[in-house]
């Protein structure tokens, strides 16, 4: 599970990330990112709509995305807000595919403080 300090919960943080941030997308997800004060820890949020599937499918996608970001939150630059928005094809994606999509999007957005070698 993501540490409480790294979880995005307030709607104004989500709105700020969508409005002022940049985004990179793949077939399965879109990663939105914005920056805040450098003194704050990086925070991550997830959006998985009903278009992805029923409750069981949505929760499975959220669990997989949380697991991927849990290991990458320490690599993010301080003060970064990241929202991962799952698209309908993410329902049939494997964890490895979601991991590859998240890694590619974070790298292309330039959000990593240190580079992690590919597996």
Curated annotation (Swiss-Prot):
Q: Does the keyword Nuclease apply?
A: yes
Function of the protein: RNaseP catalyzes the removal of the 5'-leader sequence from pre-tRNA to produce the mature 5'-terminus. It can also cleave other RNA substrates such as 4.5S RNA. The protein component plays an auxiliary but essential role in vivo by binding to the 5'-leader sequence and broadening the substrate specificity of the ribozyme.
Fetch the InterPro entries from UniProt: Ribosomal_Su5_D2-typ_SF (IPR020568), Ribsml_uS5_D2-typ_fold_subgr (IPR014721), RNase_P (IPR000100), RNase_P_CS (IPR020539)
Q: Does the keyword Nuclease apply?
A: yes
* GO MF terms, alphabetically ordered: 3'-tRNA processing endoribonuclease activity; ribonuclease P activity; tRNA binding
Provide a GO CC annotation, any one.
Answer: ribonuclease P complex
Reaction equation(s) it catalyzes: Endonucleolytic cleavage of RNA, removing 5'-extranucleotides from tRNA precursor
Report what the protein is called.
Ribonuclease P protein component
Q: Which UniProt keywords apply?
A: Endonuclease, Hydrolase, Nuclease, RNA-binding, tRNA processing
Q: Which organism is it from?
A: Beutenbergia cavernae (strain ATCC BAA-8 / DSM 12333 / CCUG 43141 / JCM 11478 / NBRC 16432 / NCIMB 13614 / HKI 0122)
């Amino acid at each position: 599970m993501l540490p409480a300090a790294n979880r995005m919960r307030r709607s104004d943080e989500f709105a700020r990330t969508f409005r002022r941030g940049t985004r990179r997308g793949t077939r399965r997800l879109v990663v939105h990112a914005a920056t805040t004060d450098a003194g704050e820890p990086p925070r991550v949020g997830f959006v998985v709509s009903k278009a992805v599937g029923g409750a069981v499918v949505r929760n499975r996608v959220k669990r997989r995305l949380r697991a991927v970001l849990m290991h990458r939150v320490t690599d993010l630059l301080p003060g970064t807000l990241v929202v991962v928005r799952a698209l309908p094809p993410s329902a049939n994606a494997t964890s490895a595919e979601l991991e590859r999509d998240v890694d590619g999007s974070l790298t292309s957005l330039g959000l990593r403080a240190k580079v992690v070698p590919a597996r």
